[in-house]
């Protein structure tokens, strides 16, 4: 949004990681002017009022699903021809529903390897689509809500506005709500009637200064650690006013027996002194990034933990349901794997080397088991560099010593 705004936008509280650096690097490759101060966690972006400074080029998005989906949509709305490349991991993740709707809007997309996947060549629609032609598309978001977020984010580039009908059973979600709220903060309003999304013509992003929220997804690992060990965690500036759906994980911890409180510094989680957790059945559709975190806690519960409505996580950095089942089995924990759910039975984990599948959330979540069980080793722990490169240093700093 900062790149598409008119003028200079300053972003404060930026999380620097492999994903965000690949996104910023892609913007630089497209000719956008940025100033980066990692120590101050500030990025300044010179927006180009809904245009791309160059009309050809190649970008590399790494393993970042957000960069892959958002930048593909942005380039499809632009003028020129571009190549989008990605890591081997990202090349396996679904893109076809987004490609299909972008082609319906007039973009030309050529898959350079496997049909429906990156890498691709994109020829944008600007200058080739009649300015008065109504833009109306249908979209299936069952595989990823990022497809819809991508279209919404670039909708101000479409002068005649955009109408999106959602054809999948799922119509909305926590990340879509975040997208809409942030767009509104930047001056672009999205209407939603329960079935369809409407963006009026003439919408523009306004430049300014934007304070980014703390990463609640990252905070949840440390909140889970408190619940698991009977300890206490406060994450600065994480409050109930945050937009992120992963706040629901804190309510889940409360239902499992942890104490959740407000403090002047941020939300606090205190685990039961005996470290005991209750079994639970939960629909995690809207905060599925924490599925692995809950799976790591589940063996220590007093009953079964059943996680439902998570079939879409099979299509993320790894087949996450299968990865959870496999690694819990390596720990000696029994579970029942289903197409879109998993039931985990309580037990006593044994020492094991946990495989991470180059999935940052597998590495971070399963490290929590090691807080209660000796002999837990995480293979390829630095895959967490994708979103939280200092995770293990932070975790180590919080662990008490004899």
Predicted feature locations:
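Structural preference for solvent-exposed beta-strand-turn elements
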Residues: 1-402
């Amino acid at each position: 949004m900062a790149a598409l705004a008119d003028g200079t936008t300053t972003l404060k509280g930026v999380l620097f990681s492999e994903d965000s650096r690949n996104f910023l690097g892609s913007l630089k490759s497209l000719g956008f002017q940025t100033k980066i101060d990692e120590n101050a966690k500030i990025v300044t972006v010179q927006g180009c009022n809904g245009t791309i400074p160059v009309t050809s080029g190649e970008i590399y998005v790494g393993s970042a699903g957000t960069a892959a989906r958002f930048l593909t949509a942005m380039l499809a709305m632009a003028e020129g021809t571009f190549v989008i490349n990605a890591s081997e991991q990202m090349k396996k993740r679904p893109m076809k529903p987004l490609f299909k709707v972008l082609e319906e809007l007039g973009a030309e997309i050529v898959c350079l390897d496997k049909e429906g996947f990156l890498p691709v060549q994109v020829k944008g629609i600007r200058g080739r689509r009649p300015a008065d032609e109504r833009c109306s598309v249908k979209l299936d978001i069952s595989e990823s809500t990022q497809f819809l977020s991508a279209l919404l984010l670039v909708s101000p580039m479409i002068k005649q506005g955009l109408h999106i009908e959602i054809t999948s059973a799922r119509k909305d979600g926590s990340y879509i709500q975040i997208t809409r709220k942030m767009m509104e903060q930047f001056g672009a309003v999205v209407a939603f009637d329960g079935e369809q999304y409407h963006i009026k013509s003439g919408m523009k992003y306004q430049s300014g200064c934007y304070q980014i929220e703390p990463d609640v997804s990252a905070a949840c690992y440390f909140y889970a650690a408190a619940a698991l060990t009977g300890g206490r965690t406060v994450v600065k500036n994480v409050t109930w006013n945050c937009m992120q759906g992963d706040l629901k994980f804190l309510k889940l911890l409360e239902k499992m027996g942890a104490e959740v409180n407000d403090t002047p510094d941020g939300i606090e989680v205190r685990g039961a002194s005996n470290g005991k957790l209750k079994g639970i059945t939960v629909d995690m559709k809207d905060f599925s990034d924490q599925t692995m975190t809950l799976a790591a806690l589940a063996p220590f519960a007093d009953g079964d933990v059943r996680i439902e409505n998570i079939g879409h996580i099979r299509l993320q950095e790894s087949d996450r349901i299968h990865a959870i089942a496999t690694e819990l089995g390596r720990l000696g924990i029994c579970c029942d794997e289903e197409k879109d759910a998993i039931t985990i039975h309580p037990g006593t984990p044994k020492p094991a080397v946990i495989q991470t599948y180059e999935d940052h959330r597998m590495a971070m979540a399963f490290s929590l088991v090691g807080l209660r069980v000796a002999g837990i080793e995480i293979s390829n722990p630095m895959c967490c560099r994708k979103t939280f490169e200092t995770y293990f240093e932070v975790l180590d700093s919080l662990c008490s010593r004899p």
